Regions:
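A structural signal for short, hydrophobic/glycine-enriched beta-strand patches
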Residues: 14, 19-189
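Membrane-interface helix-boundary motifs at transmembrane edges
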Residues: 2-7
């Protein structure tokens, strides 16, 4: 009875993992999510501010080696750097603390500061929100820091897969922002 049921459940779980790992099903599921907010083309003529969501940084490795360590979502940082140059008058904000319970003293912001310095940008031009642990806190803690005014155009940079969630929480806190998705992972079908 029970042993047979457990074996059947284990077999089914293993089969599901294999299907997700070795077939294009994962990309097929990810693709519609990544397409919810299209890439900005053309870019707006004017932007008042740019918010970079955390998630591309590896604070533990940055701290250990003293140089910026990035993960596969590094495109968000390079996009932030490029947009900061394109819109030099825009206010710049990075939002991301740590979700790592073992390394609460390490912030993603330090990685961003080092990266921007290496890119020739002054990290002091950026406001840093370093307490958030999730997307909701990114929006809730960044809005009072950035103090956006009515009618201003703000871009929010994040991975294409997470930008729908980010847009939802930014709207929930009463901040109307424009999505700037990057770090696509699903192939174009």
């Amino acid at each position: 009875g029970r042993a047979r049921g457990a074996q059947w459940l284990l077999g089914l779980s293993s089969a599901c993992l294999l299907v997700l790992q070795f077939t294009p099903l994962t990309e097929a599921l990810l693709y519609p999510l990544e397409q919810r907010f299209p890439r900005l083309d053309p870019l707006p003529a004017h932007v008042d501010g740019i918010v970079l969501l955390g998630g591309a940084q590896r604070p533990v490795m940055t701290h250990a080696y003293g140089q910026p360590s990035l993960n596969a979502a590094a495109e968000s940082l390079t996009s932030f750097s490029a947009l900061a140059r394109r819109y030099p008058q825009a206010r710049l904000v990075f939002t991301g603390g740590t979700g790592d319970p073992l390394n609460q003293h390490l912030s993603e912001a330090e990685t961003v500061r080092l990266f921007l310095r290496e890119q020739g940008l002054d990290p002091a031009q950026v406001l840093y929100e370093e307490r958030s642990r999730n997307t909701y806190e990114n929006a809730a803690l960044t809005k009072p820091l950035a103090r956006p005014k009515a009618g201003e155009r703000w871009l929010v940079i994040g991975s294409a897969a997470s930008i729908p969630r980010a847009m939802g929480v930014f709207r929930k806190v009463g901040w109307n922002v424009t999505a700037y998705p990057c770090d696509y992972n699903a192939n174009h079908w």
